[in-house]
Regions:
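Conserved alpha-helical "signature site"
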Residues: 1-253, 291-296
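Terminal helices and disordered tails flanking the catalytic cores of nucleotide-processing hydrolases
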Residues: 1-8, 255-297
Length: 297
């Protein structure tokens, strides 16, 4: 079968459903240093559904506030810039990812739940490894596999050949995708990220999370460490999380790349970390349920 053309990929990207415009506007405002809490509150209130989702997330167990948050202004003030930003991307990601992707054997909700799981795991590891801003790791984990919503049909049509290649040549699923189709879901994901005008740090997560060994040497150390943490969270999500597709266990955990950013997974590191992540699964379930109820409003 001939490889997929760039024009076919771009065509699929252009067919993606419209994302919530107020959420996109807020995400872009938060990339601007001049934006203040009052301006953000005013824009969020323009969309009642988006407002409802923000408030429901604020009051979920995942955020653990001791009192109920009842207004957008209060939410913006209490959450802080970084947490609000990751919350907005959570709402955007649900719209984009909460769909079946049969090419990867993902039923409706699987890709979304997997993304949410990886996000929570990445944030936890980010705190553990003292990242300057673990919320960026959360957002990176959330959006890392957005390329699958575009590449899924092509993977489905070529899955037998891709799987056979992983076995025959002992390569991971990402490399086999590219060999058979001409693209992989990380490359395609960067196209989606650019269409949505995501910030460069998130584009880099999407492009490199499976292969942190290929990170550009010019990348700031904190960003390189964050992407490596998403790489680790991605691997552990496939092991102990939910929603992994037919490619879930066909990737390699790059211990050397992790070591280069100061994360040593030798000894009982992984065993202890997995225990911590399993304890987070009820919080992930509550977060997913909060989003589901909010989406029905």
């Amino acid at each position: 079968m001939p490889k997929v053309t760039l024009q076919e990929i771009i065509g699929k990207v252009e067919q993606l459903p419209q994302l919530p415009q107020v959420a996109l506007r807020v995400s872009r405002m938060m990339e601007e240093s001049a934006t203040n809490a009052e301006k953000l509150s005013d824009v969020i209130r323009l969309d009642p559904s988006f407002t409802s989702q923000v408030l429901r997330l604020c009051n979920s167990a995942a955020y653990g506030f001791s009192r109920r948050i009842s207004t957008v202004k209060e939410a913006v003030a209490i959450l802080g810039h970084s947490t609000l930003k990751s919350m907005v991307y959570t709402i955007i990601a649900k719209v984009a990812l909460d769909r079946p992707v049969p090419g990867y054997s993902l039923s409706e909700g699987d890709l979304w739940y997997n993304a949410l799981t990886c996000a929570v795991y990445a944030k936890h590891i980010g705190h553990r490894e003292r990242l300057p801003d673990p919320e960026v790791a959360f957002t990176g984990g959330l959006l890392r596999d957005i390329g699958k919503i575009v590449l899924g049909d092509f993977v489905g049509a070529n899955y037998a050949e891709i799987e056979a290649l992983t076995t025959k040549e002992r390569i991971d699923f990402l490399d086999a995708e590219e060999r058979v189709i001409g693209f992989n879901h990380s490359i395609v994901g960067t196209r989606v990220a650019e269409k949505w005008n995501l910030p460069p740090v998130l584009v880099n997560v999407i492009r490199h999370h499976h292969k942190p060994v290929k990170l550009p040497p010019t990348l700031p150390p904190a960003e390189a460490k964050m992407i490596s943490i998403v790489h680790l969270a991605d691997a552990l999500t496939s092991m102990v999380g939910k929603g992994a597709g037919n490619d879930g266990l066909m990737y390699c955990l790059d211990a050397d790349a992790l070591m280069r950013v100061g994360i040593n997974i030798q000894g009982d590191y992984l065993e202890r970390l997995i225990g911590e992540l399993v304890d987070l699964n009820p919080i992930i379930k509550d977060l997913a349920e909060s989003m589901s109820i909010a989406g029905d409003n």
